[in-house]
């Protein structure tokens, strides 16, 4: 009777071993079929760099088209208003 139990245990171990082998093969297949993300990462990094360059250029254009003008001092502002009213 103890031999029968040992045979059953041995058969169970063999079945588990076969399942582990099948699972390992499936893992190997999945690993082999994973896409290479390094190329995709490199392309995304290049696009991010290009986007940063474009943003910088747009900001420079915006600064040129919309410069910060200093406030006109009070006495000059009055003179300009008087000139405008004299022209009318």
UniProtKB/Swiss-Prot annotation:
Record field: compositional bias (Low complexity): 77-88
Source domain of life: Viruses
Annotated keywords: Late protein, Viral occlusion body
Region (Disordered): 65-88
Claim: Membrane is one of the keywords in the record: no
Function in brief: Seems to be involved in the morphogenesis of the polyhedra. Forms extensive fibrillar structures in both nucleus and cytoplasm. It is involved in the liberation of polyhedra from infected-insect cell.
Full protein name: Protein p10
Source organism: Spodoptera exigua nuclear polyhedrosis virus (strain US)
Source species taxonomy: Viruses, Viruses incertae sedis, Naldaviricetes, Lefavirales, Baculoviridae
Gene: P10
């Amino acid at each position: 009777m103890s031999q029968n139990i040992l045979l059953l245990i041995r058969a169970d171990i063999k079945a588990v071993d076969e399942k582990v082998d099948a699972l390992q093969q499936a893992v190997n297949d999945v690993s082999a079929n994973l896409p290479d993300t390094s190329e995709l990462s490199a392309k995304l990094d290049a696009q991010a760099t290009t986007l940063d360059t474009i943003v910088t250029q747009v900001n420079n254009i915006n600064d040129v088209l919309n410069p910060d003008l200093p406030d006109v001092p009070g006495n000059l502002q009055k003179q300009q208003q008087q000139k405008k009213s004299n022209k009318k």
